[in-house]
Amino acid sequence: MANPHARGELERVDWQVAGIGRIPCKVAEGLWPGQFSVTIEFEFKGQRERLRTLAHDSDVYLYGERPSGDRLVDGEIRVRVLGKLDGGVLVRLPQETLNSGPNIVVPKSLVRGEIRELIPSG
């Protein structure tokens, strides 16, 4: 995995360019080898959110040891920064969450990495 502390990269997403960022999360073992169960918790506009998703281990940066059994560990999940929306940042997770789609709006302060304005690729 690339250096998780490096500045954001650029990636072409459909017709626009978006930054790559990371969001803090709690990480547990997944059902399969190379898979993690990820929980993202945050507060946005007075609403407490708790989202769960599965992610390939290449999309998750662990701060320390790997999770095992029931033990959760701190980490960050890689996201595509799609733009600013509704006072927050619209990001795309590597997989859909268990309670919504892959795109979620989070507070800007939650996203680590560069957040750039979207630029038409034409």
Residue ranges and their predicted role:
Residues A2-P4:
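Intrinsic N-terminal pre-sequences and regulatory tails
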Residues L10-L110:
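Basic/aromatic-rich interaction segments and small domains that mediate binding to polyanionic partners
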Residues R112-G122:
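Short, charged, intrinsically disordered terminal tails
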